[in-house]
Amino acid sequence: MLYTFDQVSKDVVKKLQGKDLRPVRCLSDATKFRQFDILQKTPQSLFFKSEDTPVGYSLLQILEPNFPVPETEVSAPMPLKHITSQKWKADVDVKATIADGGASAEFVQSCGYDIEVQSRSIPDSKLESLQNRQGPWGKLLDKKLSFVTDCQMGRNNLYVVTEVFEVTKDTVVQGSSSIDLSGKALVSQLVKGEAQGQWQRETTDLVPIPKGAVLAYKKKQLVIENNTCAILLSANAKKKTFPGIFNFGMSSRSQTMEIVNSSWIDYIPPIGRIEEPVHLDFKYLEKEVFLRKEQLAMLSKDVQDVVFSNLLPMLSDSDVLFDLINMLELDQLGHMDGPAGLILDELRKNSSTPWIDLKGLILYLLQALMVLSDTQLDLLAQSMEMRILLQQRELVRSILEPNFKYPWNIPFTLQPQLLAPLQGEGLAITYELLKGCGLKMEPNSPRSTWDLEAKMPLSALYGILSCLQQLVEA
C-alpha cells in the first residue's frame, strides 16, 4: 500500500482548505508550477475538468524587461502528517480426507507522509495596486513567442501561477505491506503425526519528494490585448485571454467545442417552455458523449483498434497518461515509448477522416480518465478485459439521468435488471468503480444515495464507458 505523489498533493489540498487551490498531479511536473509560470487549458468537455498544462514559459519571458515585479510573500513552514494502517487477521479450519487442522493469516498495510510545506504568494492587493498604477501589467515582447500565437489561434485561455505550496526539505513517502501465513495439521490416516509451517513476505515502497517540489498552486487568468498583458484578478469576471478574436484559423477541436457551446449554451427556448441550464440537464451530457461516439465510429477499424489496444496497458500508469495529455495539449507530437508512442505514431500518420479531430477525441478520453483515481483506472482495465463496459455504462446512465440536476443527497435504488448481467467479480468491480466516484455502495445492497460530489467523476465515467464500448464494437 503506497501513497503516490498524486495522493499526497490531493491530501495536502484538503488539509490546507484554500479556495481555488489545485493539486499538482505528477512528481515530474512538480518543478513546472513555479510563480509566474504560464499554464494553458484545453477542455474537451463541458462536464468534467481538464488538467492545467505548463507551456514551458514564464510570464516574465514574454513581457518586456524592466517592469516592476511585486515582491513575493513567504509563509512560515507548515508541518503536515498523515499515517494510516490497516490490519486483517483470519483463522481457517481445514477438514480433509487425510488431515485435519487450521491456518491463520495476517495482512498488514501502512502508508503515510510527514512533510513540511510553505507558501510563496503574491497577494491580490499587490497585483491590483500595481495594475491600478500602471494599467495593464506589462507589454509583450515585439517578437511574439510561437506558443502565444498558437493559443491565440486556438482560442485557448492562458493562466499564470500566483501562489505555490512547496516542500521545504527532502521527504520520503513510504508504504509497506506484510503477509504472515501459518498453519498446523494433524495427519490422521496414512501417517500419524503433526505438520506445521509458516510463510512471510514484506514489501516496502519509497517515493522521494525533493526540497522545492510544488504540491499545490493557485492561478489567475491572463488577458492579452493590444500587445499588453494583464492578470484577471476576479475569478467571476467573464473574459477570454484573447478577447475580440474571431473564429478564423480555429483548430477543428475549437470549432467542435464552439459548435457544441453555441448550440447548447446560447440556445433560447421558445416562450412558455422552461428548460434546465446545461450543467443541470443530463441530455446535454448525453449529446456531448453521442457526438464523440459518432466521430469515433467514423474512424477506420484499424485506427479504433490502435486506440483501444494501447489505452488498456496505459491505465496502470497515470503518469504516462498525464505526459501524453501534456504532449497533445501543447501540440508537440514528440517521442514516447510503449503504447503512448504507438498512439502518437497514429496521430502523425494523419490517416483518419480529414474532418474528424483524432487528437481531440483522444484528448477527450484522456482527460476523462484523469478524473478517475489510480484504483479506478485499474478497475476499468479489468472491466475492459472482462468486456462488461456496456452493462456498466447502462448502470451509470441509470444513476445520472434521474439525479443529474439535484444538488442535494437523494436515496436511490439500482435497477435489478441492470445488476443481473454483472454477477460475481463483475459486480464487485462495478461497485468499487462507483464507490471511487463518491457513492456509498454496499456489497449486498442495491441502495445508495446521490451525492453532488459524485456528479463530475460519474459524468467522466459515463463518457469513458461510452467511448470505449464504441471502440470494442469496431
Curated annotation (Swiss-Prot):
Keyword Membrane: yes
Pfam families: Gasdermin, Gasdermin_C
Gene Ontology biological process terms from the UniProt entry: defense response to bacterium; programmed cell death; pyroptotic inflammatory response
Residue numbers spanned by region Triggers pyroptosis: 1-237
GO molecular function terms listed in the Swiss-Prot or TrEMBL record: phosphatidylinositol-4,5-bisphosphate binding; phosphatidylinositol-4-phosphate binding; phosphatidylserine binding
PTM description: Cleavage by CASP8 relieves autoinhibition by releasing the N-terminal moiety (Gasdermin-C, N-terminal) that initiates pyroptosis.
One cellular component term from this protein's GO annotations in UniProt: cytosol
Top-rank lineage group of the source organism: Eukaryota
Listed InterPro entries: Gasdermin (IPR007677), Gasdermin_pore (IPR040460), Gasdermin_PUB (IPR041263)
Keywords assigned: Cell membrane, Cytoplasm, Lipoprotein, Membrane, Necrosis, Palmitate, Transmembrane, Transmembrane beta strand
Comment text on domains: Intramolecular interactions between N- and C-terminal domains are important for autoinhibition in the absence of activation signal. The intrinsic pyroptosis-inducing activity is carried by the N-terminal domain.
Protein name stated in the entry: Gasdermin-C
Gene that this polypeptide is encoded by: Gsdmc
